Amino acid sequence: MHYPKVYDVIVIGGGHAGTEAALAAARMGRQTLLLTHNIETLGQMSCNPAIGGIGKSHLVREIDALGGAMALAADKGGIQFRILNSRKGAAVRATRAQADRVRYKAAIREILENQANLDIFQQAADDLIVEGDTVKGVVTQMGIRFDAKTVVLTTGTFLGGVIHVGLEKSSGGRAGDPPSIALAQRLRELKLPVGRLKTGTPPRIDARSVDFSVMTPQPGDFPSPVMSFMGDVSMHPEQVNCYITHTNEKTHDIIRGGLDRSPMYTGVIEGVGPRYCPSIEDKIHRFSDKDSHQVFLEPEGLDTHELYPNGISTSLPFDVQFELVRSIRGMENAHILRPGYAIEYDYFNPQALKFTLETKAINGLYFAGQINGTTGYEEAGAQGLLAGLNAARRAWEQEEWTPKRDQAYMGVLVDDLITLGTKEPYRMFTSRAEYRLMLREDNADQRLTTIGRELGLVDDVRWAAYCEKMEAVERETSRLQHLWAAPNNPMGKKFVEMTGADLSKECSAIDLLKRPNINFGQIAELTGSEVSQQVGEQIEIAVKYEGYINRQHEDVAQLKRLEETKIPADFDYDVVSGLSREITQKLKTVRPETLAQASRIPGVTPAAVQLVMITIRKNNMTKKTA
């Protein structure tokens, strides 16, 4: 059957990348189709039931600032909230939400089903319709043809997915779901640069069989933080504890004894696993000097006894899993509800993508999520939103948009993937961003919501809330600049009495806030401020970090000069005099779009960038005189 409706955007896959891609395109007014193999698994958390964390929550806030769904779903489904790095600087603080899987998934589905311009269809995609070098649509498993101006692929771990438990293996996209074999084969036929990666998940445990009395409880923070700029604590369901226990030497001996049947250590698995989320087999091998590792027992939801034992991801045979779980303190009688497993899947070298996440080889075809070599819900969601918005803009022949490294962690993510490529699952960290003081979790809305509004991603309700917040920040900052404390006036005396600090000369309330040991709460009490905590936090960070932020702005200004120098798509690196063969090959492989991107390619020296710049200028001069 040839479906009669022609779509602007078709999104294949209903995971974290796919849902954000479909929602972004539909919010922008494009006729959008979301194809999923199972409507019941839309927004499914395939592994850890948590959103956020170091570096990751910055991405979640950026998705939220652009009108995305992930943060709001985390607020509606979160059963424990914590601020990580709370004693460190604002740049590296991160919010983490332990989520109820069912509530999170329900929140995502509700948003999808109520989004205008979005159709959902349950059917696996088996083929892409490609005419010449342009994608024209999709053919489903039943042979239904859907035509579209653009297609976004967000296939997660489903492309050629193989599940491993010990030396036994089976085809699967995740436990209980079939893989995408036909689509994987079709993509290989298109000569896209394919590789294999691996990820894994731990066995799930029945909480009724666990002795929590010998474990350390880990409560959430109070007052509870929120994930979304539009969120509120009233959205949160009941809050619960997680628990901490540890592996021991007996556990490690059991694991070592099973390595001869490990698919990772017998060469059965060829794909590379995530460096920053290693299996328990990897941990005892790589950190052999450690006699124990932490295990976090995390509830999967409020209406289930299922626990996620974070820290013991494994693909060992089930009998070894059984023994290793029962060797851990408090889990001596543990019942395993689901075995742990590893999954191996196809991914495509992200260096074959444009910065818009469109493939260089096929016009109108976009990739997002694990297909690009990343790991994590947050990284997937960020790519999905960018791919969705750019597919939407291409469909209407509008200029596409991707944030720069100084604008967003999304920009860092995309630039890293396309400039550097990846041979292992890529995870975001704050350390990957040069301008992290400017790219904080708390100011994602200030960086991106205005842009999102211009792109058509931000609705009237979110825009009004953002404008109201920024007006409150401006009003309160101005008020504090005009309130003065002096050694002999009432406000000055109250300040000294409250804080025990010295006050030798007249200062504005803003100047008092600049002091390292003074926080906004104290200034609010001193001056009778009634603004929200969010507004107060913005003012405090802006005041305390003003000097550092100004210096980063100067660094960005220097970088922009390189960013503004575009390298023509057909630029011939072979004619650049003085370039080494090695650097020439690297530049030809990556095909950087700007001098700034060229400068970030490993092994490309500043002198080489200078040579490229000189050649570009010579070429431009030649064209002008021709």
UniProtKB/Swiss-Prot annotation:
Cofactors: FAD
Binding site for NAD(+): 273-287
Keyword S-adenosyl-L-methionine: no
GO molecular function: flavin adenine dinucleotide binding
Family matches, as InterPro entries: FAD/NAD-bd_sf, GIDA_C_N, MnmG, MnmG-rel, MnmG-rel_CS, MnmG_C, MnmG_C_subdom, MnmG_C_subdom_sf
Presence of keyword Cytoplasm: yes
GO CC, any one term: cytosol
Record keywords, A-Z: Cytoplasm, FAD, Flavoprotein, NAD, tRNA processing
Signal peptide residue numbers: none
Main location class: cytoplasm
A Gene Ontology BP annotation from the UniProt entry: tRNA wobble uridine modification
Cell compartments where the protein resides: Cytoplasm
Coiled-coil residue spans: none
Source organism, top-level taxon: Bacteria
Residues engaged in binding FAD: G13, G14, G15, H16, A17, G18
Family, per entry: Belongs to the MnmG family.
HAMAP family: MnmG_GidA
Role of this protein: NAD-binding protein involved in the addition of a carboxymethylaminomethyl (cmnm) group at the wobble position (U34) of certain tRNAs, forming tRNA-cmnm(5)s(2)U34.
Assembly, per entry: Homodimer. Heterotetramer of two MnmE and two MnmG subunits.
Protein name (Swiss-Prot/TrEMBL): tRNA uridine 5-carboxymethylaminomethyl modification enzyme MnmG
Protein's gene: mnmG
